[in-house]
Amino acid sequence: MATVLEQSVPAELNPDPMLPMPYRIQRVRQETDDTFTLELIPTDSHDGFSFAPGQFNMLYVFGVGEVPISISSDPADAPRIQHTTRVVGTVTKAMRLLQRGDLLGIRGPFGTHWPVEEAIGHDVVIVAGGIGLAPLRPALYRLMAQREKYRKIVLLYGTRTPEDILYRRELEQWRGKFDLEIQVTVDRAASTWRGYVGVVTTLITRAPFDPSNTVAIVCGPEEMMRFTVMELQKRGVAAQRTYLSMERNMKCGIGLCGHCQYGPVLACKDGPVFTYDRLAPLLGRAEV
């Protein structure tokens, strides 16, 4: 049987994957000072697409440029989709100025996916750092939609400050509605903060899961993922059941330009989701 690394979910691409399809902005929601979510619907010219948790799109701001962004919405809501984006460059700055009713071009969905089916019958540990919660959010939706198929589900989430926490209201709803363990930590906080303080890896040692029967999925800054994997391995989580999302300088989305190549893999085509045993020799290596 093919694994998540050997095949991508067949994406409902338009006949020309290099041609952006028009989407209309339905809603703009400010998440934090530098992060926002766009909710988009397909225009009347096409029907949109379905996607698997962990896949990404290339978002095109007409007249400005294109940037790869993971899909952050519930797969069950497709073709309505959401993208949560941090303002970090020219394209995302222009994207932040878009308003309800404006058009955005989308190519995709591209890439491999989180192992939500492979994790059935296991404990699932989800470790997110900062904006890394956004690519993991579709997996959380899918896990909760079929909660009875999994054992423990644990979300460990780290941000810089309490003000940087994404989807704060949603996290509280999930904690109360589902059998879901959620632990949040921040790097620094005022004395009024009642949660954990410290890097997210400090949560792993006390998190309630069975390492011998756990699937772990991790997304965040590369350095954070490296240390997270180290702590998971100390607990006994197998490298082949530890999944990371690597999104490095993707341009075409279909493996043609080679811009996202590092080592023998292309992040846009072979990833962005990889098992750690495959990715371990490449972590920290610059693109070729």
Language-model segments: residues:
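FNR/FR-type flavoprotein reductase catalytic core
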Residues: T3, T90-K251
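Ferredoxin-reductase
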Residues: E6-D102, R160-T161
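Short, charged beta-turn/beta-strand-edge "cap" motif at the junction between a beta-strand
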Residues: G63-E66, R107-H113, A286
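Local cysteine-cluster metal-coordination motifs and their immediate loop/turn environment
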Residues: E223, E247-P272
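Non-heme iron-sulfur electron-transfer modules
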Residues: G263-V288
